[in-house]
Amino acid sequence: MKFLLDVLLLLPLLIVCSLESFVKLFIPKRRKSVTGEIVLITGAGHGIGRLTAYEFAKLKSKLVLWDINKHGLEETAAKCKGLGAKVHTFVVDCSNREDIYSAAKKVKAEIGDVSILVNNAGVVYTSDLFATQDPQIEKTFEVNVLAHFWTTKAFLPAMMKNNHGHIVTVASAAGHVSVPFLLAYCSSKFAAVGFHKTLTDELAALQITGVKTTCLCPNFVNTGFIKNPSTSLGPTLEPEEVVNRLMHGILTEQKMIFIPSSIAFLTTLERILPERFLAVLKRKISVKFDAVIGYRMKAQ
């Protein structure tokens, strides 16, 4: 009963906050400057990570680029240097905790305190539970989730000490809405979204107001990791479009970025719709891509 009374007493605040949010829709938020900030991007040798590096280079940030692919990393670094940025590269296996901690130690000693951390590195296996090998499941969680813990533990203390920083989690719409035959990937991205939300709340509980958090949750992106993707929610997203939205979200300090925005509506529907209706709705959305179905192979 006391809890219900407390909720009722908060209704005036709910009305004020709702009006405030509505008004903000029509007032563009000022973008912050990232000139001179030390920005570390994991998975910078390809796709979203590479394009994000280009955008920070244009904004005169100092770049620290990590990737397991040395050739891709060097290509990204060369373009960023051509844009006038100072660039440092490290070949890092984000599935290896000790590799992450070792590289982080070098970054802090040789370059300085990272003030913007973009946890972008990721892997995906398009297969059902039976066709996904145990090492693939382990690697999915090591790269897509656990690496976020290790990088954040390495670089967040300095941000908290300075009360200045930004942790960016590149997740997925699959971190909010489940997709068959992406079991390991969806599970890891649900965990990544949970990491972002809980880290945000921990920082608030500790009254660390200067360290911001942003989570990116796009639909299928045309980066080549998933073959022949399609969905009735819209066309496959181009990396440039996603990175433009990501940069806007970082610079305006948005907490959650859904691309397309209809994903946010879908996540709300999933919580309130009857299960039977929701099952029909998911079939209508018609998510398709090339996948290996191990269950059928076992049955043959």
Swiss-Prot record:
Keyword Signal part of the UniProt annotation: yes
Q: What is this protein called?
A: Estradiol 17-beta-dehydrogenase 11
> Where in the sequence is the active site?
Y185
One molecular function GO term is: estradiol 17-beta-dehydrogenase [NAD(P)+] activity
Q: Which reaction does it catalyse?
A: 17beta-estradiol + NAD(+) = estrone + NADH + H(+); 17beta-estradiol + NADP(+) = estrone + NADPH + H(+)
Binding sites annotated in the UniProt record for NADP(+): 40-64
Q: Which family does it belong to?
A: Belongs to the short-chain dehydrogenases/reductases (SDR) family. 17-beta-HSD 3 subfamily.
* Organism from which the protein derives: Pongo abelii
Catalytic EC class: oxidoreductase
* Pfam families linked to this entry: adh_short
Name the source's superkingdom. Eukaryota
